[in-house]
């Protein structure tokens, strides 16, 4: 009788696996096609962030992961979305999130839905900004709320983190900001989206709730090259 092998991921393991994949896609780009690499990075980091939120919610109470708590623990029933997990962590778990982070989580979910269920048009710079901001949030949340470090004595000790900082300047700036002063911001009104021209762009994330684009706001002139 042959050896039987079990493949198993708990919530945290599932989340960190996806985030590690996003990290590798950014830090070790190599000769990979940028369009495919960044699309996969957005998908995996969005998946990982949602599962990190659910894992934190599970630690409040496992039943809270289910959309209808009475359905716990049926795997055929729907679990909460990232929005739902965020709301329950605030109202039941007692956690606080900056407006900037709440906007990020919601915009990230919308972008992932566009990729997986419809169509997605973006630029390399926009995609890198999405991934950079999401990775910074994920690493901060995992350590602060779940006691998990992606880079440390018990995890990765190679030069991946240095490579990640060099590969994505948005990530580097976000990490520096979180380390220095946190990430609290006041809510801002929606602004004009430069892509669809609707007043529907979130001032914190730069994500448009109508067309899905994430606009990079800067005083410096840049050329945003499409894939």
Descriptions of predicted regions:
Residues 58-65, 125, 144-178, 224-225:
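Long amphipathic alpha-helical segments
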Residues 190-202:
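Short Cys/His-rich zinc-binding micro-motifs
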Residues 200, 211-222:
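Short Cys/His-rich micro-motifs in 6-15 aa windows
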């Amino acid at each position: 009788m042959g050896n039987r092998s079990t493949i198993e991921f708990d919530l945290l393991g599932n989340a960190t696996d996806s985030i590690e994949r996003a990290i590798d896609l950014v830090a070790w780009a190599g000769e990979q096609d940028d369009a495919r690499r960044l699309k996969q990075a957005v998908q995996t980091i969005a998946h990982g962030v949602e599962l990190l939120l659910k894992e934190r919610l599970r630690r409040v109470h496992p039943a809270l992961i289910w959309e209808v708590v009475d359905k716990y623990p049926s795997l055929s029933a729907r679990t909460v979305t990232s929005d739902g997990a965020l709301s329950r962590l605030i109202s039941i778990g007692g956690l606080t999130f900056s407006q900037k982070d709440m906007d990020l989580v919601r915009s990230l979910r919308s972008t992932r839905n566009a990729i997986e269920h419809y169509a997605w048009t973006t630029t390399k710079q926009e995609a890198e900004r999405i991934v950079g901001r999401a990775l910074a949030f994920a690493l901060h949340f995992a350590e602060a709320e779940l006691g998990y470090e992606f880079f440390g004595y018990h995890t990765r000790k190679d030069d991946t983190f240095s490579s990640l900082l060099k590969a994505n300047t948005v990530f580097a700036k976000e990490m520096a900001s979180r380390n220095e002063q946190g990430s609290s911001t006041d809510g801002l009104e929606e602004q004009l989206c430069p892509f669809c021209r609707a007043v529907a762009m979130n001032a914190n994330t730069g994500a448009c709730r109508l067309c899905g684009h994430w606009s990079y706001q800067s005083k410096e002139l840049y050329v945003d090259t499409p894939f």
